[in-house]
């Protein structure tokens, strides 16, 4: 069993993955486990510390989530965050109750006592709160380490036991010294060393792949995006002669995508590629389907069917490799107590019964780590820094039913958006950019004539890992040129809007 420096127990926060990511940025390997993991499994990981995540439940409710109480008797440092903080207080007989004043957003805290958590940090800090419960009294044996205007027990701890509790979320970017607090917990409380990196990850994953696969063969599904390209490169580095790389044209690709993917794998990466045109079957099954969850599940099921049919043509194929990431896992909620945001076609969208076993070597890392891994494996920056493109493709960028006319319309406007962003230098400055066909018509005037045509939405966001995102502040002249070109060059569009929503509350993709 793989060891972990720090274990993060997931109580349902959508930001649980960020805790692990922030620690990994410091070179500390952190792993996430369900909140109800057994004490034996925790001991087997030989952690140097434990973090209890936030979550949507209340410790005083009948449906509260509780970890094994023996965690507090292991002699390990423990850090409780939000719900984890309230859980620690509850365990040590303090009272947790609904807060009269709920806190959501930025708050200012003031450090009241020196602590390992706040080593070399300023006394006053801005942090991110997100809670509706409060700790009403200090647990026995603990002392206040920091306060805020609405939280007199904002941070408390027991330095002897190295138990610490935070009401705020240090893992989100809005907590200005949150990264430092997590680093201090790992370094000064847990005595962790900064030795984890993508080089060591690549080596470990290659060994795991060889051990799991043995002499069998692996079907590797690729889309041309960075995730599947890195998976293919990782498999090739581990078991090159046993990998069959397959690209499926599902009819939901961007303009020129099929040709780009085929060229990249054969000419740039030097990997043999089997290309399958399955557009008819995908589009026929999506006909008259409007619900986004149904779209994702249909696409997921159909992908598996196509891959399983291809596998029958080759001997000893027992595995299917996919580029599932941590962000896919958390949004599809198959870790801990997290609530489902949406199913991903390669997580919640998969059929229950598959003839192929899944290999997902990237499911424990984030997008930025995938890119670092890609560079480590020798992929070009052009491949590694392509904008993310979802597995369900343009199907989840068309509101409502997916059909060929809508796909062609969306492809045309998408080409214009990307051309303008690349020509102005904004493509490389942003995380992701795409258009959404709203399937909503509006009145317009072109020349002397009335029009009643489609509206299209532009979505461009900045992010570091995809877990949170803000809309990109594109210059007005860039937006104006994009809008002008789309309306003038694409028949059937008379209105362009810009999505200025952040994640949360919105997701990056519309469906």
From Swiss-Prot:
HAMAP family found in the cross-reference section: GMP_synthase
Residues the entry annotates as binding ATP: 223-229
Function: Catalyzes the synthesis of GMP from XMP.
Single GO term (MF): GMP synthase activity
Reactions mediated catalytically: XMP + L-glutamine + ATP + H2O = GMP + L-glutamate + AMP + diphosphate + 2 H(+)
Active-site residues per Swiss-Prot or TrEMBL entry: 82, 169, 171
Subunit structure: Homodimer.
EC annotation from Swiss-Prot or TrEMBL: 6.3.5.2
GO CC entries: cytosol
Organism whose genome encodes this protein: Campylobacter jejuni subsp. jejuni serotype O:23/36 (strain 81-176)
KW Nucleotide-binding (keyword) present: yes
The protein's name in its UniProt record: GMP synthase [glutamine-hydrolyzing]
């Amino acid at each position: 069993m793989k060891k972990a420096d720090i274990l993060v127990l997931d109580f349902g926060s959508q930001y649980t993955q960020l805790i692990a990511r922030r620690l990994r940025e410091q070179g500390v390997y952190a792993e996430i486990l369900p909140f109800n993991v057994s004490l034996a499994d925790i001991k087997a990981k030989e952690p140097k510390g434990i973090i209890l995540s936030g979550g949507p439940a209340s410790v005083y409710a009948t449906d509260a989530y509780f970890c094994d109480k023996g965690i507090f008797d292991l002699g390990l440092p423990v850090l409780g965050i939000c719900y984890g903080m309230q859980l620690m207080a509850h365990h040590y007989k303090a009272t947790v109750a609904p807060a009269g004043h709920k806190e959501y957003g930025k708050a200012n805290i003031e450090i009241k006592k020196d602590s390992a958590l706040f080593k070399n940090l300023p006394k006053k800090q801005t942090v991110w709160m997100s809670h509706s419960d409060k700790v009403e009294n200090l647990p026995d044996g603990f002392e206040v380490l920091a306060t805020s205007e609405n939280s007199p027990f904002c941070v408390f701890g027991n330095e002897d036991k190295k138990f610490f509790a935070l009401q705020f979320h240090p893992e989100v970017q809005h907590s200005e010294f949150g990264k430092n607090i997590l680093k201090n917990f790992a370094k000064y409380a847990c005595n962790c060393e900064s030795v984890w990196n993508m080089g060591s990850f690549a080596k470990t994953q290659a060994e795991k792949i060889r051990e799991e696969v043995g002499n069998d063969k692996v079907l590797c599904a690729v889309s041309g995006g960075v995730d599947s390209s890195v998976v293919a490169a990782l498999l090739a580095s581990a078991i090159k002669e046993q990998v069959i790389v397959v690209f499926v044209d599902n009819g939901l690709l961007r303009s020129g995508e099929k040709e780009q993917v085929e060229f990249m794998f054969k000419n740039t990466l030097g990997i043999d590629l089997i290309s399958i045109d399955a557009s008819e079957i995908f589009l026929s099954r999506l006909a008259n389907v409007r619900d986004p969850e149904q779209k994702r599940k249909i696409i997921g099921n159909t992908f598996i069917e196509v891959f399983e049919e291809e596998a029958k043509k080759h001997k000893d194929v027992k595995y299917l490799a996919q580029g599932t990431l941590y962000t896919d896992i958390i949004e599809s909620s198959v870790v801990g107590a997290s609530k489902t945001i949406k199913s991903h076609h390669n997580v919640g969208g998969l059929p229950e019964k598959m003839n192929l076993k899944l290999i997902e070597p990237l499911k424990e890392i984030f997008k930025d780590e995938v890119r670092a891994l890609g560079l480590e494996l020798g992929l070009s920056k052009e491949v590694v820094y392509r904008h993310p493109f979802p597995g369900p493709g343009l199907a989840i960028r068309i509101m409502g039913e997916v059909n060929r006319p809508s796909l062609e319309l969306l492809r045309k406007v998408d080409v214009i958006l990307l051309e303008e962003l690349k020509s102005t230098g904004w493509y490389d400055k942003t995380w992701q950019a795409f258009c959404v066909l709203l399937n909503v018509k509006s009145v317009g005037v072109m020349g002397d004539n009335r029009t009643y045509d489609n509206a299209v939405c532009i979505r461009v966001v900045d992010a570091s890992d995809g877990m949170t995102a803000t809309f990109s502040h594109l210059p007005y002249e860039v937006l104006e040129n994009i809008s002008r070109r789309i309306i003038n060059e694409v028949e059937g569009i008379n209105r362009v809007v810009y999505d200025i929503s952040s994640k949360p509350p919105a997701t990056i993709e519309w469906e």
